[in-house]
Amino acid sequence: MAVAQTVEDFLAKHGIDYTLVSHPHTGSSHETAEAAHVNEDHIAKAVIVKDTGGYAMVVVPAGNWVEIEHLRKELRRDFHLATENQLAELFSDCEAGAVPPLGPAYGLETFLDRALSSLANVYFEAGDHEKLIHTSGEDFRTLLGGVRHGYYSHDN
């Protein structure tokens, strides 16, 4: 699979330069970091949550866990993790589990962990389990312009 069409269109719309990093098929963020020879802290991972208001995306470093209780308290919303079936519906142009952390591209409210706010380079899922998109941290933050920033995760 190539880059998910939604992602490709979103990058083009914003005039973002990027490179693709190919790696052997992986099943987790940790495996992806090892296979691509990239520090986990530089890979942005998407976690999809849901409440009565709909879906939202939390973008955190790949080696971190989302602090769901903290998210609930800070935002005063009753979030829980979305199911695999729900993810398949939301990200129909992506392989299961290979969710690109570009909530605005998919029309999702997005929360960006501050741990990703000052990186010079960011890597993220292209929509399959064999490619990462590499872009500058500045361009990544441009793609997520206007999203809420906070501390939403902790180290794994």
Predicted regions: what they are:
Residues M1-N156:
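Extended, low-hydrophobicity, polar/charged segments
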